[in-house]
C-alpha cells in the first residue's frame, strides 16, 4: 500500500512542507481547512486540528504525530471519526541531482476498516495517496529558489 513519487526539490525542502502543519490541507486530499496546529509540530504527540469535507457538511477531527525522524520519516495517525483511524507513513530519501523520493504508506489502524484485506484497502487509498504526493510535490517544487523570480 505504498505510493512513491520523485519530487524535483531537495529532501530538506520537502521536509519543510511536511514540518509546516499549516500546509496540510494543501496537499492532503479531503482536508478542507486547518483549525489549529500545535506549536512544536511535528514532534511526537503533537496534533493538527482539521476539518474534512465541504462546508457546511464538515467533520472536525485531528491528526496526531506517532513518530518523527526529522528530514527522513513522519508517521501520522489521522482520525476520521466516527469511521476510523489511518496510520500514514511518509519516508523521504535523496535522489541524484538534489531531488527527493517520497514513499507514502497508509493502512487502517482501527476497526472496521482494519478488518478489510490489504488489497481492498489499497483500492481505496492508492488513488488518493497518488494525488496527495502529487500535491505535496507541487508545493515543494513551487518554492525552489531558482524557480522564483
Residue ranges and their predicted role:
Residues 8-12, 39-42, 66-71, 91-101:
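A short, structured loop/turn motif at beta-sheet edges
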Residues 17, 27, 58-59, 85, ...:
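Alpha-helix N-cap/helix-start motif
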Residues 77-131, 147-149:
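Beta-strand/loop substructures that line and gate deep hydrophobic ligand-binding cavities in soluble
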Amino acid at each position: 500500500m505504498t505510493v512513491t513519487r520523485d519530487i524535483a526539490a531537495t529532501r530538506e525542502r520537502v521536509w519543510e512542507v511536511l514540518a509546516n502543519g499549516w500546509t496540510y490541507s494543501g496537499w492532503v486530499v479531503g482536508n478542507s481547512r486547518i483549525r489549529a496546529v500545535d506549536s512544536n509540530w511535528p514532534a511526537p504527540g503533537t496534533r493538527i486540528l482539521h476539518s474534512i469535507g465541504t462546508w457546511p457538511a464538515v467533520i472536525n477531527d485531528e491528526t496526531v504525530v506517532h513518530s518523527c525522524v526529522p528530514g527522513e520519516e513522519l508517521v501520522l495517525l489521522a482520525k476520521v471519526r466516527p469511521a476510523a483511524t489511518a496510520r500514514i507513513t511518509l519516508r523521504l530519501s535523496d535522489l541524484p541531482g538534489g531531488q527527493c523520493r517520497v514513499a507514502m504508506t497508509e493502512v487502517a489502524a482501527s476497526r472496521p476498516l482494519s478488518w478489510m484485506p490489504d488489497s481492498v484497502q489499497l483500492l481505496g487509498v492508492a488513488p488518493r495517496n497518488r494525488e496527495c504526493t502529487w500535491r505535496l510535490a507541487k508545493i515543494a517544487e513551487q518554492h525552489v529558489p531558482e524557480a522564483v523570480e
